[in-house]
Amino acid sequence: MVLKFSVSILWIQLAWVSTQLLEQSPQFLSIQEGENLTVYCNSSSVFSSLQWYRQEPGEGPVLLVTVVTGGEVKKLKRLTFQFGDARKDSSLHITAAQPGDTGLYLCAGGGSQGNLIFGKGTKLSVKPIQNPDPAVYQLRDSKSSDKSVCLFTDFDSQTNVSQSKDSDVYITDKTVLDMRSMDFKSNSAVAWSNKSDFACANAFNNSIIPEDTFFPSPESSCDVKLVEKSFETDTNLNFQNLSVIGFRILLLKVAGFNLLMTLRLWSS
């Protein structure tokens, strides 16, 4: 009798556990540094509490937060945790993700028996933004060796670009280039001179240039060449244009004929 009762209790516990499964989505997530993300945790059953853990490679899970009240919202710096009103779901939102946020995120629901039911986890990978090193590029006119332009780009916003003491060298103020097609911005400045011995290595002498700035060798300067693209007409497009012109002429003739007939009727 006691054995049957114990087996019945065991089956009840197993049935309760089987209905307390947690589903996490997405299972894998890879984003760039600075982006936002949301991880979801759902169940068909009600939990008395819900916990979020983060596990880094080679280490054990670390508790981030515990929520117990339906509709509860907790914030931990850039992390926001929310427990659903029905206590069946939860979400983790990370703002401006950093490479240090990389890891496995686990949600765990607590039942009335005091045990925890874990989800399968969400593996997050945050790729760091690789800022390009500052560089100076020299552009020479292919038709005249006396004309040269230096482009100083990808430098830090704290860098000061000063005018040259040489009256024959002209330097623009620091500007921000918005590379919308590549989704990033870059600081830049331009220097130019008509002097034949003008060198980019000396153009920004009065400015504080980072030590890791790339300077091209005199042999590796870029020749600016004018490339003329040949223009070829499209026969189909030409036919369509001629058709439109023809229809317009026909419309004008019809309108003129109608106007002439109307004037004749009025005059008679």
Swiss-Prot record:
Domain Ig-like C1-type: 147-235
Region annotation CDR2: where it falls in the sequence: 67-69
Annotated effect of mutating residue 48 to A: Decreases the affinity for M/matrix protein 1 peptide antigen
UniProt-annotated location(s): Cell membrane
Signal peptide: 1-19
Main location: membrane
Record's protein name: M1-specific T cell receptor alpha chain
Organism listed in the record: Homo sapiens (Human)
Lineage: Eukaryota, Metazoa, Chordata, Craniata, Vertebrata
